[in-house]
Curated annotation (Swiss-Prot):
Entry-linked InterPro entries: GPCR_Rhodpsn (IPR000276), GPCR_Rhodpsn_7TM (IPR017452), NPY2_rcpt (IPR001358)
GO molecular function, one term: neuropeptide Y receptor activity
Alphabetical keyword list: Cell membrane, Disulfide bond, G-protein coupled receptor, Lipoprotein, Membrane, Palmitate, Receptor, Transducer, Transmembrane, Transmembrane helix
Any one GO CC term of the record: plasma membrane
UniProt subcellular location: Cell membrane
Disulfide bond sites: C7-C87
Protein name according to UniProt: Neuropeptide Y receptor type 2
All ranges on the Cytoplasmic side of the membrane: 30-49, 122-146
Family: Belongs to the G-protein coupled receptor 1 family.
Length: 146
């Protein structure tokens, strides 16, 4: 049956999708920041672009791996003679639940707080650059001055 395989695969695929999306949005914000704020710098080469994409997927795969590793596919007895199949998280030393909590908190920081800060900073710098930008030839045009 596919139950045990999907028990490990589905949470991993979900986590991987979220993580690679978050990292990709952060990389896009950083690239836009670089292109607008430092527009005279050289372009990123194709090789570097592929390296960044590969790193985004690799880091995402690594960060999502605990979602596949720490799973348990088992029968749970609800009442005598009635069992259900369940796919649950099974962290080592689960009596205190510390590993699952640590993973969740680190995921919150790495996948929400840090990208939010980086993206906000990048777009704030872009906004500041564009707000203070004067187009060539428009410096003496009173219509464009604010």
């Amino acid at each position: 049956k596919m139950g045990p395989v999907l028990c490990h695969l589905v949470p991993y695929a979900q986590g991987l999708a979220v993580q690679v999306s978050t990292i990709t949005l952060t990389v896009i914000a950083l690239d836009r920041h670089r292109c607008i704020v430092y527009h005279l710098e050289s372009k990123i080469s194709k090789q570097i672009s592929f390296l960044i994409i590969g790193l985004a997927w690799g880091v995402s795969a690594l960060l999502a791996s605990p979602l596949a590793i720490f799973r348990e596919y088992s029968l749970i007895e609800i009442i005598p003679d009635f069992e259900i199949v369940a796919c649950t998280e099974k962290w080592p030393g689960e009596e205190k639940g510390i590993y699952g909590t640590v993973y969740s908190l680190l995921s919150l920081l790495i996948l929400y707080v840090l990208p939010l800060g980086i993206i906000s900073f990048s777009y704030a710098r872009i906004w500041s650059k564009l707000k203070n930008h004067v187009s060539p030839g428009a410096a003496h045009d009173h219509y464009h001055q604010r």
